[in-house]
């Protein structure tokens, strides 16, 4: 990751860009979700979810948001990286910050997103439970994960 990438708290004026990153990331990694559901979720992200979490984002030297995480009550509720910046350590940096600075120890991941599951397993999380539906009651199973070890 470039040394010019910084972690910072996004402002309300960053919300439209956060939503763009969220949607691009979801479309790149959640191919099991129909378009109409992504559109519905996008509205929830903008109108409810961003305000319900403590946010941190990675910005580059041009102040573009490369990825972001949201934590509430010891849980990573959001971690999304723009597709063109995946594999560059952005998600790892955001997750490690969420764990070390925001006391995150739990998260849920879509069962149908094996790349995210592998990432969280690599970062020291383990699956401890499963639900048949997502947070809105739709048939997209979630795996419940908890931190069992920290990585360096």
Residue ranges and their predicted role:
Residues 87-100, 118-122:
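Conserved acetyl-CoA-binding loop-helix of GNAT-fold acetyltransferases
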Residues 100-112:
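Conserved GNAT acetyl-CoA-binding A-motif
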Residues 20-46:
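Conserved GNAT-fold acetyl-CoA-binding loop/helix
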Residues 46-57, 75:
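A short helix-loop-beta-strand connector motif used in the catalytic cores of GNAT acetyltransferases and
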Residues 54-67:
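Conserved beta-hairpin
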Residues 121-130:
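Conserved acetyl-CoA-binding loop of GNAT-fold acetyltransferases
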Residues 75-86, 110:
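A short, internal acetyl-CoA/4′-phosphopantetheine-binding micro-motif in the GNAT/acyltransferase core
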Residues 5-20:
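A short beta-loop-alpha structural element at the N-terminal edge
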């Amino acid at each position: 990751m470039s040394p010019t990438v910084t972690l910072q708290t996004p402002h309300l004026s960053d919300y439209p860009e956060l939503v763009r990153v969220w949607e691009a990331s979801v479309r790149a990694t959640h191919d099991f979700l129909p378009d109409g559901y992504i559109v519905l979720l996008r509205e929830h992200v903008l109108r409810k979810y961003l305000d319900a979490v403590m946010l941190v984002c990675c910005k580059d030297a041009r102040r573009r948001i490369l990825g972001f995480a949201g934590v509430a009550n010891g849980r990573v509720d959001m971690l999304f990286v723009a597709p063109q910046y995946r594999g560059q350590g952005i998600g790892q940096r955001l997750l490690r910050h969420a764990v070390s600075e925001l006391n995150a120890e739990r998260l849920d991941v879509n069962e149908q997103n094996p790349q995210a599951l592998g990432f969280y397993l690599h970062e020291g999380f383990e699956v401890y439970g499963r639900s048949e539906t997502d947070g809105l009651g739709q048939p997209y199973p979630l795996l419940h994960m908890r931190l069992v070890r920290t990585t360096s």
